[in-house]
Amino acid sequence: MLYPLLGVFGLCAGVTTLLFGFGGGFFAVPLLYALLLTSHAAGSPVALHAMQIAVATSATLMIFSSALATWRHQRAGTLRWDLVRPLAPAIALGAMAGAWAALYLDSTWLRWLFIGYLLLSLLDAWLRPGFMRVGNHGPVPLGKAAATLAGLPIGALAALLGVGGSVMTVPLMRRRGASMGTATAMANPLSLPMALAATLVYALVPAPGANLGAGLLGYIDLRAALAMAAGAWLGMHLAAPLLGRLSDTLHARAYLALLACVLVVMLVTGR
């Protein structure tokens, strides 16, 4: 495994976690998936489970990156905990179900689910009103029932695909009146319960017959996660001066542009 390259992956993940709430998954999953396929023989256990390893390692990275980004946003005063608390328990429950399902899905199917999820997210944000421009009113908190109904699928899909909750929570909060700064800041603490629950499942409940070798805890590549975490720390340090300095429109466009870049990477990366 090329650890300096993983450090660069982590640096990109750190920047996008702090500024866009991605938690690292949108960079870590496609890049680690591609690296695993190119560094292991076709048909080997690691190659056959490359997507699961990428997703599981991404979830582990998110524990570190989302926690650090949450701390930085708390210091910057950009967090709204009244919007975070109602969603967190349902996201954690959904994440456990999503991670368990990912263990038993074929890696190719998981890849295409990831691609489909990205494409739908882009189309929804671009075509449905409420994402590119929001009103002047402040964000409206979700009620308990609405938070549960929204949190369960957010947690399940985020853990299934290893992407964090940003791609669902940011559009949700945008359409409830949140600025991009507030919406992306809240994506980080909302990714934490997902990352913790998913990592627990990926570490302790591996799929039967998956003998992946040393250095892995369940499906989690611990060495890759550590290398990317080091890069993520540096990336957040470099991105910190930009917090609160991006215009809302530029922030929203950059968010969608990053999703489009990841979609292209996943489309051109295959077995």
Model-predicted regions and their roles:
Residues V163:
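Conserved, well-structured core segments that form the ligand-binding/active-site neighborhood
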Residues M1-F20, F27-I53, T57, S66-L160, ...:
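Juxtamembrane transmembrane-helix boundary motif
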Residues A185-P189:
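A conserved regulatory-domain signal marking ACT and ACT-like small-molecule sensing domains
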